[in-house]
Amino acid sequence: MQAIQYPLAVGTGTTRIIEAGTGPTVLFSHGLGARADRWRTTVERIADRGYRAIAWDLPGHGFSTREADGPSDVPALAAHALAVMDALGVAEGVAVGTSLGAHIVAYAACSAPQRLRALGLVGALGIVPIDQAVAERISRNVRVSTREQFDGKLRFVLHDPAAVTDALIEEEWRTNTAPGTIAGFARIGEYLTTRIANDYIAAQLKVLFPPDKLLLVWGAEDKAVPLPVAYACREALGEPALAVIPAANHCPYFENPAAFDAALLPFLTHAFAGAA
């Protein structure tokens, strides 16, 4: 099913929505320095299975508004996620977030547990403590500004070098060097290295969401958020299912979609069981 995209007013700015399908709503949140179209093919595949699938650009990312005082920490980004749901008329759904996007949807779920039935957490940051070196590396990677640096950044998060095409590098460079973008990323990067510890969310998640309402998905070759973090998340959250995706680095939904969907689709069926 082909997705559509359109602008959506949220707060004082706009975001971009990528959407396909009808049915129970599944929301997809990208991570720091990425954008909604990383999820486009996933949105289309999940829509084909009977869901309304939606991805959106985080503030300051993709085609969303750049604001000098835009959201730059997880509590504010989580509030924005709930505002996106409001603007779309989505009363409840399941959220799937990757990297910092996983922290964002987890924080949103703890803020408004009646809005999110279950969570898929992919290569998740911010659930359990991360090494300072990991935070600093991510912060550096989102401040890059040349095509050569974007080439290196993409090779760091994608397992197959052939996936790093000239077209992808060019798109990444043009989108992430638009006026105001790097400054916005830098503010979030500073949060990662100095303040994220205030917002780790595992303890709250464990209280509010039983293990069968949580799914962990990790690339077997994840270099950005290494696999030991997945095991720490599983222990902290009461042993939810963990799917380790082969031949995938930090973007398993993009790198090995068949294996990713094989983990996600049964989880969605269970999450929406009994929904009106």
Q: Regions from the language model: what does each represent?
A:
Residues R16-F63:
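Conserved HGGG/HGGXW glycine-rich cap/lid loop of the alpha/beta-hydrolase fold
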Residues E221-V225:
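Acidic catalytic loop of the alpha/beta-hydrolase fold
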Residues P210, L216-W218:
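Short beta-strand/loop motif that positions the catalytic acidic residue
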Residues D48, A55-L100, F254, A262:
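Active-site loop/oxyanion-hole signature of alpha/beta-hydrolase fold enzymes
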Residues M1-V26, D48-Y51, V90-A91, L268-A276:
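Alpha/beta-hydrolase fold catalytic core
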Residues I130, R147-L208:
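Conserved alpha/beta-hydrolase catalytic His-Asp/Glu region
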Residues E239-A276:
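Catalytic active-site module of serine/aspartate enzymes centered on a nucleophile-bearing elbow/loop
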Residues A106-C110, R117-E148:
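Flexible "cap/lid" loop of the alpha/beta hydrolase fold
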